[in-house]
Regions:
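Well-ordered alpha-helical scaffold segments within catalytic/enzyme domains
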Residues: 59, 63-75, 122-133, 163-179, ...
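Non-catalytic carbohydrate-binding regions of carbohydrate-active enzymes
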Residues: 245, 249-283, 314-476
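The feature captures the catalytic groove of carbohydrate-active enzymes
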Residues: 27-51, 58-61, 150-161, 195-261, ...
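Acidic/polar, glycine-enriched structural segments that form the non-catalytic walls/loops
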Residues: 23-112, 172, 177-179, 188-193, ...
């Protein structure tokens, strides 16, 4: 088994825990009052027309047992953090084949057994990896790998997926090697199935936009086999993840096979899907021409750290903050606003991806931006302030008629939810938010080794305090506090990290740190 872990060079804070002994934290540092207040409010404004495994009456108790606690001065981000966990548990469904998470709160005719849908599977695993009880996500992953394939009409391949990448990143949180050992044969089989179904002789993958869950797009088609940054980035991320999982298990033949596939696909994406004249990753048609639109899907390669660390690629991100590009009052548009076909495919009759704001894509783009800011030297014009402002805008967008709401997609100028009051759209489980707060804003970076890494993307002087508490990571409780003056939490000034209730790091500045955890 290969156990060597490579880390990038950066300034670290390295502490030894040779004398550290396990300490059971009796209660979270933050307490549960804020959680209880939010749940009471969300319950009060809800009609609860659909009840699944965790009803509103049990929402507080379930959340108290399962979610990390969070507090910050940004009331929008804080409120929506708890709202998103509250809505997420609405979709937890107990079936004869174990737990699953639904996408639509009401039954939809084009879904699979138990109203299952795979389009946002990657988002759901990333979000759910922070739940304390692993049974929910374990069951959900096994549902797609073992239950869905036995159906008369399997649905996993109805949509492109980054399931392997999500499973590996789930492992990085809970360190459950046995689970990886159980599922890697099925993941390996699934990858081969994608190759058989969607891989071209060039070794790139093709996909219809509707099968990327991005229909009615400017560049896409329901009949033309376009080479898209979406599925090719996903398959790259899946290959990298399979290589790492195989390495973890000491299966060198599988590790080497997928490492080779990842290297090959990375080169193909950069050589074939990068349009130098547009400075953007774009869809390429079968005739070799590029679609003439910059679309938000062009940011997806960074989600998986695919692009090389070069200024030419980083330049693409300038479009994110350009009002003629993707910057709109209510969020990040799915196509550049300057394009003549922007928002021309109608509104609300289907699922139009020709410019409206989709939380699904916003999640991908913000994750990609976080990867750029924390893993690349060449960041272009991007800064933590850009990430923070976009996340704040994303939080503010969760509103309808003055109360918290999560739907399918929005008008970029007014914030109107384009499916209106369609019942299927309420609490739409098709994106992520809590993971963006934990993993990217606060910056808890799960790792395969015995290190605790925190890389905050909170701009300097943005907040005087915040706390992320009760995070279950590698079987231990993690708390991350920032208290500039020491007057908020009364535990001292500065940046403080706790493991199982004991402070193990203090420093004056909010910065990137790397700590050795107890064995």
């Amino acid at each position: 088994m290969i156990r060597r872990i490579f880390t990038s060079s950066f300034i670290t804070v390295l502490l030894s825990f040779a004398a550290y002994s396990a300490y059971a934290q009796e209660k979270p540092l933050l307490g549960y009052n804020k959680l209880k207040t939010y749940v009471s409010y969300f319950n009060a404004i809800d009609t609860e027309t659909v009840k699944n495994y965790v009803t509103n009456d049990h929402a507080y108790n379930w959340m108290a047992k399962n979610i990390p606690l969070f507090e910050c001065p940004d009331s929008a981000i804080q409120k929506i953090y708890y709202y998103r966990w509250w809505t997420f548990r609405k979709h937890l469904k107990q079936t004869p084949d174990g737990f699953i998470f639904t996408e639509f709160i009401t039954p939809v005719k084009f879904t699979g057994v138990y109203n299952s849908s795979s389009s946002a599977l990657g988002h759901q695993i990333y979000e759910g990896r922070w739940l304390h009880d692993p049974q929910y996500i374990n069951d959900y992953i096994k549902f797609w790998l073992y239950v869905d394939p036995k159906q008369k009409k399997p649905h996993l391949h109805t949509f492109s997926s980054w399931i392997d990448d999500a499973v590996y990143n789930y492992y990085l949180v809970n360190n459950d090697k046995k689970f990886i050992e159980q599922v890697i044969p099925a993941l390996n089989t699934d990858y081969r199935q994608w190759e058989a179904e969607k891989q071209l002789p060039s070794k790139l993958f093709w996909q219809f936009d509707v099968r990327d869950a991005m229909e009615e797009s400017i560049s896409g088609s329901r009949i033309v086999k376009n080479k898209r940054p979406t599925i090719n980035s996903y398959m790259y991320g899946n290959a990298v993840a399979l290589s790492k999982m195989a390495s973890l298990l000491g299966i060198d033949s599988v590790k080497n096979k997928y490492s080779k596939k990842a290297i090959e696909l990375k080169k193909l994406v950069q050589d074939s899907l990068w349009n130098d004249s547009a400075s953007f990753f774009q869809v390429r048609r079968p005739d070799g021409s590029f679609a003439d639109a910059r679309e938000e899907l062009g940011f997806i390669p960074w989600y998986f750290k695919l692009p090389d660390d070069k200024p030419a690629y980083a330049k693409q991100w300038d479009q994110l903050t350009d009002e003629k590009g993707f910057n709109a009052p209510w969020g990040i548009t799915t196509a550049e606003r300057r394009h003549p076909l922007f928002r021309t495919h109608g509104t609300g009759h289907g699922c139009e991806w020709d410019g409206a704001v989709w939380p699904f894509a916003t999640t991908q783009t913000l994750k990609g931006l976080a990867v750029l800011l924390t893993n690349y030297q060449n960041k272009g014009s991007m800064t933590p302030a850009v990430f923070y402002n976009e996340l704040h805008k994303y939080a503010l967008s969760h509103i309808k008629r003055g109360v918290p709401y999560l739907g399918e997609y929005q008008d970029e100028k007014t914030g109107y939810w384009l499916k209106g009051d369609n019942p299927r759209s309420s609490y739409y489980n098709h994106s992520g938010f809590c993971d963006l707060v934990i993993n990217d804003l606060v910056g808890l970076k799960p790792r395969a080794d015995n290190m605790l890494e925190v890389f905050p993307l909170i701009p300097q002087n943005q907040w005087k305090w915040f706390a992320l508490d009760n995070v279950l990571y590698h079987g231990q409780r993690i708390s991350i506090l920032w208290d500039k003056t020491g007057s908020k939490y009364h535990k001292g000034k500065g940046f403080i990290i706790y493991i199982d209730g004991k402070p193990i790091m203090r420093c004056a500045k909010l910065k990137h740190v790397l700590l050795k955890m107890p064995v």
